[in-house]
Amino acid sequence: MSQPQLTQEALAREAALPENLWIQCPYCKQGSYRESLGNAQVCPHCHYGFRITAKKRLSLIATATEEWDADLVTSDPLDFPGYTEKLAAGQAATGLKDSVWTGQATIGGQSCALGIMDPKFMMGSLGTVTGERLTRLFEKATSANLAVVLFCASGGARMQEGIHSLMQMAKVSAAVKAHSNAGLLFISVLTDPTMGGVTASFAMQGDITLAEPHSLIGFAGRRVIEQTINQKLPQNFQRAETLLQSGFIDAVVQRQDQPSYLGDLLALHTA
């Protein structure tokens, strides 16, 4: 039996369809129309927050902003093969010079120092400029008597910068400690993914630690752990909800609720 032939009208309608009309949620695996994700880019089935750029998140979370240290640019200290090209690709994809945006912002009517790591820039990896901007964020917040809100998203330390990258863990942590010693609030918001050296340092040093639904949060990856202990891990291992049940974080907050939730926390701290 021969297959029916598509008419010219049907072919024209097919050609007129936009590309990437559907998108699959990486967590629940359900398919959705892209339009159904809304401006916040959230899965309508499980509320997983899709990975977004720092500038997109900034538009969702803050009503007034002033960027700090935007002129800092990463060099290539180890002359690592292909690194310059990766930096250029990250800059083109995000509009940032490195993997973090920092500055002063208003969230829910409350002024604070704000940092947003960008998973679209080399998976938000921690390099020298990212570490320097975060360090300056906490130092300026301490001087200005401001609380800090930091959205973490990272695959960990940036291997292309070697020991220069690893040093940022201690440097940022020292600035966080000085900010804490001044009696100021630090709210850490863990998004998908928050892994490696970022989790092992400043991401988990917040006075209040929040997370987005189903975010992957941990140090080593799942496969590495399973191969090390020779056991299969639970399905939701390293997910935000499991960390909440274990007491590692304080709350899981949906992306749409974050401006008001953070605004309330900041208002309570300054009252």
From Swiss-Prot:
GO terms for molecular function: acetyl-CoA carboxylase activity; ATP binding; carboxyl- or carbamoyltransferase activity; zinc ion binding. A zinc finger (C4-type) spans 25-46. It catalyses: N(6)-carboxybiotinyl-L-lysyl-[protein] + acetyl-CoA = N(6)-biotinyl-L-lysyl-[protein] + malonyl-CoA. Its main location: cytoplasm. Pfam families: Carboxyl_trans. Binds 1 zinc ion per subunit. GO terms for cellular component: acetyl-CoA carboxylase complex. Its EC number is 2.1.3.15. Transmembrane segments: none annotated. One of its GO terms (biological process) is malonyl-CoA biosynthetic process. Keywords: ATP-binding, Cytoplasm, Fatty acid biosynthesis, Fatty acid metabolism, Lipid biosynthesis, Lipid metabolism, Metal-binding, Nucleotide-binding, Transferase, Zinc, Zinc-finger. Residues 21-271 form the CoA carboxyltransferase N-terminal domain. Zn(2+) binds at C25, C28, C43, C46. Belongs to the AccD/PCCB family. Acetyl-CoA carboxylase is a heterohexamer composed of biotin carboxyl carrier protein (AccB), biotin carboxylase (AccC) and two subunits each of ACCase subunit alpha (AccA) and ACCase subunit beta (AccD). PANTHER family: ACETYL-COENZYME A CARBOXYLASE CARBOXYL TRANSFERASE SUBUNIT BETA, CHLOROPLASTIC. This is Acetyl-coenzyme A carboxylase carboxyl transferase subunit beta. It comes from Lacticaseibacillus paracasei (strain ATCC 334 / BCRC 17002 / CCUG 31169 / CIP 107868 / KCTC 3260 / NRRL B-441). The lineage of its organism: Bacteria, Bacillati, Bacillota, Bacilli, Lactobacillales.
